[in-house]
Amino acid sequence: MASFIVLAHFSCEWAIKVVLLHHYLSYKNMAYNLLKGKRGIIFGALNDMSIAWKVAERCVEEGATIALSNTEMALRMGEVDELAKKLNAPVIAADATNFEDLENVFTKAQELLGGKIDFVLHSIGMSPNVRKRRTYDDLDYNWLNKTLDISAISF
């Protein structure tokens, strides 16, 4: 209660922001077991700046059992093994443009996680133009098509 008395010295708008921040900090680390017993595959975690990385952490906090997937190259370049160890999650390499690889991910994930897959997160973002450090005014349209295929259309 003492923390709210101090707020009386600030403007109402400032007080509301502080109260909201307090509630956010109080609840952000709480888990509600929303995904308890669910199994999922998360595609695209590369490092702790990846959306997929943060979603994977939160899914496990909420009770899910997950498998992680990315390309062989991304697995070599990134820090996925660190996340896998932290979350006790298997890592299954796959090329999202290869149907056989995707079938393999689902088959292996079901075996490793012990049952059907309840959810999938497609968070694969890829651009050969960026990786090859080409500016967008020097765009290679074949690479652009591959970018769209992988980032927006794959599976």
Regions found by a protein language model. Give the residues of each.
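Short hydrophobic targeting helices and cationic amphipathic motifs
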Residues: 7-10, 23-25
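Canonical Rossmann dinucleotide-binding motif of NAD(H)/NADP(H)-dependent dehydrogenases/reductases
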Residues: 32-68
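Glycine/Thr-rich phosphate-binding loops of Rossmann-like dinucleotide-binding domains
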Residues: 50, 76, 128-131
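Conserved glycine-rich Rossmann-like NAD(P)H-binding loop of the short-chain dehydrogenase/reductase
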Residues: 64-80
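Conserved mid-core segment of classical short-chain dehydrogenase/reductases
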Residues: 81-88, 92-94, 98-103, 107-147
